[in-house]
Curated annotation (Swiss-Prot):
Superkingdom per UniProt: Eukaryota
Class of enzymatic activity (EC top level): oxidoreductase
The enzyme's E.C. designation: 1.14.11.8
Co-factor: note: Binds 1 Fe(2+) ion per subunit.
Catalyzed chemical reaction(s): N(6),N(6),N(6)-trimethyl-L-lysine + 2-oxoglutarate + O2 = (3S)-3-hydroxy-N(6),N(6),N(6)-trimethyl-L-lysine + succinate + CO2
The protein's name in its UniProt record: Trimethyllysine dioxygenase
Any single GO CC term annotated in Swiss-Prot or TrEMBL for this entry: mitochondrion
Location in or out of the cell: Cytoplasm
Biased composition (Pro residues): 276-288
Gene: cbs-1
Keywords: Carnitine biosynthesis, Cytoplasm, Dioxygenase, Iron, Metal-binding, Oxidoreductase
Pfam families to which the protein is assigned, alphabetical: GBBH-like_N (PF06155), TauD (PF02668)
Amino acid sequence: MRPQVVGAILRSRAVVSRQPLSRTHIFAAVTVAKSSSPAQNSRRTFSSSFRRLYEPKAEITAEGLELSPPQAVTGGKRTVLPNFWLRDNCRCTKCVNQDTLQRNFNTFAIPSDIHPTKVEATKENVTVQWSDNHTSTYPWPFLSFYLTSNARGHENDQISLWGSEAGSRPPTVSFPRVMASDQGVADLTAMIKEFGFCFVKDTPHDDPDVTRQLLERIAFIRVTHYGGFYDFTPDLAMADTAYTNLALPAHTDTTYFTDPAGLQAFHLLEHKAAPSRPPPPPPPPPPPSEEKEAAGSAAGEAAAAAEGGKSLLVDGFNAARILKEEDPRAYEILSSVRLPWHASGNEGITIAPDKLYPVLELNEDTGELHRVRWNNDDRGVVPFGEKYSPSEWYEAARKWDGILRRKSSELWVQLEPGKPLIFDNWRVLHGRSAFSGIRRICGGYINRDDFISRWRNTNYPRSEVLPRVTG
């Protein structure tokens, strides 16, 4: 589906739609506003296309239960659900621990020839008496889903794509709201899920521990070879260019992990001039005509003592969309050629993923872009493949790099104390311009799975979340 344009308007969280299948939009800007309507503040719900039209039926056959649900269903894949599968998916209090929601029976102790001896269908559910004298009750929504689908997929994950225009009114929530209630966490995680990043305004910045507490409202902070929560200045404490004052091109972090960091946060606590060195001996006084020029030059040097360091954000999913439209073959190469990645600059550290991974990782079920893994500095040797040569990969990567560097792709923002930035490291590439002076930044990583769990449970009722994760 081609992206559709979304205007640059102020939108409440409730207006940020979660419609199925409409995965991508072009995004201009968004800021969270507190809704005045109780209905607008209610949690999202997963949509259902079933309508009550028929009398329910359940009949015993040699293959399993032949089912006719009380709702009209379209795109049916089967009419019979197998006996053993049904018995294994009984969720009564005897079969599933209601506190942990884990099975508490041995699936393979069930007789392989298990079969129903009695079946009763109502408009709400189907009750089965099994040949092992166990009784199971299955809600129709569960049965109907597997009559029309093979497996549970991910939640509706509509995203909004953006470029440089997103800087006009970027996604923003307030620190007091996030810390005060799960509704605030819902706002924050929904913004990150849809747009890939969010600012948290009004965050205290005199104590970095407050930023740690903010991140822990989402989930625990991930510990890596860099430590956990970080608070650093450009002193090369670790052998990584992030610990310098050099410019950094757009990249994702931790490409060298099997499971790259899900979220990353930056909070600029301070940016000040570097401590002055002992002054050199004064030069001879300039001629009067040059005094004004020399004074202006000195003022310029003083002003540059704490400048630069703008942060760069690039929507990797939008860049991939552009690449696919402009050069489908380059997209195919970058999504199929698997590369080595590594972190080995520090003594005693040689980290690499469990296998080679492509720059653009696709969802195996849907074929949609799932994750961007791009840091040319951490990339290993391009392999010789049977389908594509290294030269072909380099040409495709050159086009990818060119898209990332387009002005229309780059969102430049100046971080400031009191306004942390949290972004999706699987989607949004980040970088910075070179800077002078001393910058102190704190932040941390959060695992992707923990972020998504928090997003689910603050944005949707648990009764709707559970079927999505348990099947």
